[in-house]
Amino acid sequence: MNILFFYRVYPNYGGVEVVTTVLANRFIKDGHGVIIASIEQPHIELACQLLPDVKLVKLDYPVCSIKNMRKLHRLIINEKIDIIINQWGLPFMSTLLCRVAKRTSCKLISVLHGAPNTSKLIIKARDKCETVYNPFLKYIYHAIMYLKEELVKASIRYNCSHCEKYVLLSSH
């Protein structure tokens, strides 16, 4: 089986990155092919933690560009990818990009690392609401927070409805 991981920032420091490294190496040891595609590769020196057979592929911003879609589609076809594991499972953009697999036999699994009812985006918006004292600004920041909460909900709904499996990894 050939597996492609997709994540925004890899290789990098962090929990999702460690999980991706461990899984990629395990899949290689089990005889599978593994590619990790990412938009940013800030700590390429961490690639030494991967077994030599794991391939790294760099994509570019904007995430959903035609260039990225074509590159990912070519990878799926040329490398005979069976499964994409989308490790960046919250923003709808990642699932939208990975939907290039829709025109192939490749299956898409999206993973949400964290609580489904919040995100960094919402936490920052809540912090802003709590630290402002001006009533007008407080109203504006609450409206912005509401819109961000709705965006996160819509992203999760989109992701759940456009992949074969949606995995939630959360302690909440």
Language-model segments: residues:
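Generic beta-sheet signal
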Residues: 59, 111-113, 169
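N-terminal strand-loop element at the rim of the active site
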Residues: 5-13, 19-20, 26-64, 172
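Short His-centered aromatic/hydrophobic patch
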Residues: 86-93, 112-115
